[in-house]
């Protein structure tokens, strides 16, 4: 064990311990141990794994702090792994000297506007456990190429940039679990310009990742932000499960945002499962653009400034057994699907609790320029002006739903409205309550067949 104090580090929070820590890496045994104390550094501690050999960094059960007072990451770990997760692709001295770099039980605090926490380049089987990174720019930055990353039981907190940043990286097999990722100005987990597969985000608390706590001007961001608009980007085979994902509403902000450019990459963002999360309090809670093959099920999604769920230019989206509602009077609820096809909405509850209709004036379920949409077995309650509002849609089926206004003073103008042009639409076997105007508005040009509905008189 290489105790950094035995190599000259003081840990007094004032002395520059940069060279002493480098001395411990250069001449130590690979287990970089920080006893209790505050270790001030002025430059990045860069570790070439091919030269140093297997590396561990330990902060003595969280009692050690590294204070980064210069620009760049406090620790930059550089490997040479150019293969995949396939054992046969691992070459050179990657297994003997580079595998499993582990950083645990240590705090990194930034004291420079461009200070980052940790940067990983071309590593294999990196492990982060019990790490606190705060007041930096970015917390953990993975770039270029990495494989088989584990991030667990970490606090990525109060950073001016991004909490966990997958930045122009080829990365397969990464688990982010049981972490607090909060109050990071430009997003909690953010993916840009990258090729990602097999990412699991599970059991985390991801909150308030926007400008508000930093007292800066608002910028579009999200708790989980995925941008594949850059050519060559693709993000597939992703699980977001059993997290709390919430925020304060901010302009163009989301809890989960997935962006693909119109007519973008050959491989759209897809093969995603978003399941069993608590998601709330943003302008749009979930906003999907250009996605192909996404399952959203079993989530409680609440309190939006615009929509609980906004889907644009997407296909094969399955929305099942979610609960949509507001949480505070000034916020709203609702689902909007635009220019999308092959979407199912099944077993969902959408409730507007505002006595006069939600502030946005939006209907509960809106469909615009869509085709092959199946809505079945849902409850759409207290929608104003409508429960379902469809424009320029074809081959839409709304069956077996309950669409009622349960308020003492009815506010719903219509239960279902189809306008514009379309064909092959079906409204059937629904339970439909009273409204203030025509219960069903089905323009002849919209091509709607209505049959077997039970209308409450």
PLM feature spans:
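Extracellular beta-strand/beta-solenoid scaffold signature
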Residues: 42-47, 69-94, 111-120, 134-142, ...
